[in-house]
Amino acid sequence: MAKSSVKYVIVQDYETGGLPGKEKRPFLDIALCEVACVVVDMEKLEIIDEYQALFKPGYKEDLIYAPEALAVNGLTMEMMEEQGKDAKSVYKDLKDLYTKYKNPRQGAIVCGHNFTGFDHPFTIELFNYYGDDAWKYVKWVEDTQKLAYYSNLEQPDYKLSTCCSLNDISLVGAHRAIHDTRSNAQLFISYIKRLRGEGNSTSSKEENRFREHFKFQIPS
């Protein structure tokens, strides 16, 4: 019996200075403000490590810090200036985290909510800016929003807050990276448990009924 080589998944989230677009590039134009990572042990399905950091403003010229974006995440320029780290230090921290929690075959696996479309491009540009390639460390990218679409054909919407609420997961201090990431890690764990059939007695009963119905119809 083969054993899964997936040992860790790093659930990650960014707070940013706005939304990227055709003429507003992630990280290079739209500022990174905050990052948080929560590491999930995939055997125990438990959180085993955390990392969070604010980015010191002005890591390059002409960065966008839209007032409406800062109003949503609650960050201020003063807070980031006083508590923030240089972007290069954060890049090194993330590289170390990806290296520490790499999987034997898959490298680092990162996950977030709408991570593929929004967050991961910031990681790519952050690493590129310092002459590195995020794909050297990250091989798989997972997305709890995608898992929500796959799991539920219909729900009010597929925002993180709604997905957490539907899965009885509290989301306190939403729109700050560490709070979003902790809740999203629990959401990710709940989806994995569902995939593994943990706590899903209905599917087990259906499977047994299916086997009982067809077991005498299989030719010997």
Per-region residue spans from a language model:
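Residue-level recognition of the N-termini of beta-strands and the immediately preceding loop/turn
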Residues: Q106-I109, Y137-E142
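Substrate-recognition/cap helix-loop segment adjacent to the acidic, metal-dependent catalytic center
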Residues: F118-W140
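Acidic two-metal-ion nuclease catalytic site recognized across multiple nuclease folds
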Residues: A2-S4, L166, R182-S220
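A structural motif
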Residues: N152-C164
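Short alpha-helix plus adjacent loop in nuclease-associated cores
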Residues: V141-Q155
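Conserved non-catalytic scaffold segment of RNase H-like nuclease domains
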Residues: A2-I124, S165, H175
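Active-site flanking residues adjacent to catalytic metal/cofactor-binding acidic residues
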Residues: Q12, E142, H179
